[in-house]
Amino acid sequence: CNAIVKEAKENNLTHIFWTESDMILPKDVIPKLLQLKKPIAAGIYFLRGGTGQPCLYKKTPLEIKENPYLHTPITMYDERGPFKVDCPGMGCALMEMGVFDKVPEPWFDLKSNDLGKTNGYGQDLYFYTKVRWAGIEVWVNPSVICDQIETQIVGYKDYRRRLMEGRGLGGGFIGLDAHVVDK
C-alpha cells in the first residue's frame, strides 16, 4: 500500500480509492463518496461470517502503550445520513491525496500476525489510528452499501437480520425508520 501511495503522489493524483478483491461495490460508489467532500469518505461493508457485523470501528476508550491500535466494533449505525467513525476498514474508502501529506510515513504497516494478534493489528487499524492522531476526520456514507464474498455473500440483509433478532445489542431498543425497506 505504501508503494501505491508513493506512485499516486508522483503522478499528482487527487484521490486514491481503496477496495479489496472480495468486495462487491455499487456502481455509483465513487460519485457518492465524492459528494461527501471529506478527506476520507467510506462506504459500509459487512464482515465475513454472515452475522451482519459492519466493518466500522471507534477508538477504544483507553489506549494502551503496548498496542495503541485497538478499536471497538460499532454494532449499529445511523442509516439516515453521513456519520463519523475512527476506522471503516479499507474495503471501500476514498481518500484525498492531502491525507498522505498530513499522516507521517509509513502510512501502512501490517503486524496482524504478531504474537497471535495479542499485540498485532491490521494495516487499516494502524493507518486510521495515525489519521486520528493527525486530526483528520473519517466519514461514512450509509447509502454506499457493499457486500463481501466468502463462501457466501454477506451484506446488509445480514445486518438487518441481526438487528431484528436482537443479537449483539445488549438488550437495547431498536428504532427503525419508516423509509428503510429490506430488498
Feature map (PLM): residue ranges:
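Amphipathic coiled-coil/heptad-repeat helices and related helical stalk/stem segments
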Residues: 1, 25-26, 124
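Conserved catalytic core of nucleotide-sugar-dependent glycosyltransferases
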Residues: 5, 26-112
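C-terminal catalytic/acceptor-binding lobe
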Residues: 97-98, 102-183
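Conserved beta-strand edge residues that scaffold enzyme active sites
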Residues: 22, 47, 145-146
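Short beta-strand-to-loop acidic/aromatic patch adjacent to the donor-nucleotide binding site
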Residues: 12-24
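Active-site nucleotide-sugar/metal-binding loop of Leloir-type enzymes
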Residues: 2-15
